[in-house]
Amino acid sequence: MVLHPGVRKSLLVLHVTCSVGMMGTVAAFLVLAIVGIGASDPQTLQAAYLSMDMLARLLILPLVLASLVIGVVQSLLSNWGLFRHWWIVVKLVASIIVPVVLLLQLPGIRLVAAAAASGLPLDGLRGPRMSFIVHGGGGFVILLVPMLLSVYKPRGLTRYGWRKQYELGKASGS
């Protein structure tokens, strides 16, 4: 099934908007994580970690999931397909890794935010706080991969893609 051009472009704009918003919020999360590690003043720590908690739960996770769902819908309703091209499969895998890692990080983010909000010392939570920098930076790099693949669209069909192309050629009499 091929989408009407107006619907296809609307989905594309929504997908790109979610993806760009997600990258921006991950960048903000990373900056706050760096500020949180370097700060000693309780107000800065509280502001940084409470903001990180809200960014992760209320912006990053919904944007990641929206981008993933919209991307899957777009590929299923277009000639590109979901499993025909390697670059789309890599985008899909990257788009699944990010929310999984984020969901695994959320309890730690909540814990540090709650400790900062209550004014408890965060010295014993240095491991999770460093993890926010590592995972935030890694997440940003992983999010760059789908963006680059979307722009360059490298050649290369999957086995499924080759089989589909062969079947289409055979059906059309080529």
Give residue spans per PLM region:
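Polytopic transmembrane helical bundles with strong interfacial aromatic enrichment
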Residues: 1-174
